[in-house]
Amino acid sequence: MGITGNIYGINGPVITIQGNLGYKMNEMVYVGEHRLVGEVIRLSKEKTTIQVYEETSGLKPGEEVAGAGCAISVKLAPGILNNIFDGIERPLQKIAEKSGAFIPTGAQADALDREKLWETHITVQEGDEVAGGSIIAEVPETKSIVHRVMLPPGVSGTVTAVKPDGDYTICDEIVTIRTTDGGTRALTMTQEWPIRKPRPVKDRYPADRPLVTGQRI
């Protein structure tokens, strides 16, 4: 857990804390007794400004604001398809099963099923050199879409151990690598990625025709 402060001002979905206590820009915070999810959007010597991504009715000055110590992130793994999320990757179907059609204040649930087993084909072998974006496994997520599990950006090394093909959860360690700095890293099918940070791409092709859906956006 990161830095803890207290609410000084409330203006709709925006709250402020007096001074700069050491929060970071885009850091995720939990606001009030219901631990509403928010994000640090502005820092100055005089105050810290936070955007709360839930209804702030009932909040009052003096309530605690706890920093998470990391940016607001989403989990990327098999299970995203056929799911419905809100803007901070809360699974709406799962919350509805527990609480009904309306999301209660501070509702929390795992974004993805951590216990579901996925048929997994490992695509690397011991001794392979891998880098960010290398495909280490494939999972048939639907009948028509294969989820390709990639090495996280910024990571590279040599594969030292692999699990055999089989059924695994998104939290099971399936590949181990020796990184270029001499460390060891065990990899699962899950990546956590900051929502404000664009995913890196090797090439970006210019659009030459519109995507026509027939739906009004």
Describe the predicted segments one by one.
Residues 13-17, 48-54, 114-125, 158-163:
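Short alpha-helix capping/helix-loop boundary micro-motifs
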